[in-house]
Amino acid sequence: TVSVISGASGSGKSSLIKLLNGVIPQFVNADIKGDIIVDDDDISQKDVAARSDFISTVFQNPKSQFYSINTTDEIVFALENRNLPKDEIVDTVKEYTEILGTKKLLDRDIFKLSGGEKQLVAITAVACMKQKVYIFDEPSASLDIDAIKRLKSAIKTLKELGKIIVIVEHRLYYLKDI
């Protein structure tokens, strides 16, 4: 399932993302009324850590969430933090870089990548987590047309894998046939 959220600046798109991934209310003080249901599960009372078991977010500027300068190190970072066995990490990275067509981005300097390549590294990193829900905040921002095509392909692939994808976006043209 792919859901697209679009709206004017200040309409609450970023707030919705923060509600879904738990930043609100854990790190941003806010009064919340009602429930937040994701895939028939009320996540309203779950903290960021609990939500990270099934929700991953790729921010508009992926380099703001990078922890390493090497792309492979970046992709395996979260898997290592979950104490997965090394052979499982290697197999997962191999599987998802093949599925997403990002194998050529392994073992590269993140600072030498284009904006689109950085976005694909971030998507590969979260895809390797095998989450149920992926949230993409303005994923096409500052990408050229070729990078948008690769982004679209990655989103289609995640959809085909049965993932729930929430996209906050202003550029809607590339999402029409996903």
Label each region the model flagged:
Residues N21:
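Helix-to-loop junction immediately C-terminal to a conserved catalytic motif
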Residues D35-A50:
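ABC ATPase NBD Q-loop/coupling interface
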Residues D87-L105:
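Conserved ABC ATPase "signature" region
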Residues D109-L113, E117:
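Conserved ABC ATPase signature
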Residues V126-A127:
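ABC ATPase C-loop
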Residues Y134-D137:
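Catalytic Walker B motif of ABC-type/P-loop ATPase nucleotide-binding domains
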Residues I145-A147:
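Helix N-cap at the start of a conserved alpha-helix in ABC-type nucleotide-binding domains
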Residues E169-H170:
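H-loop/switch region of ABC-family ATPase nucleotide-binding domains
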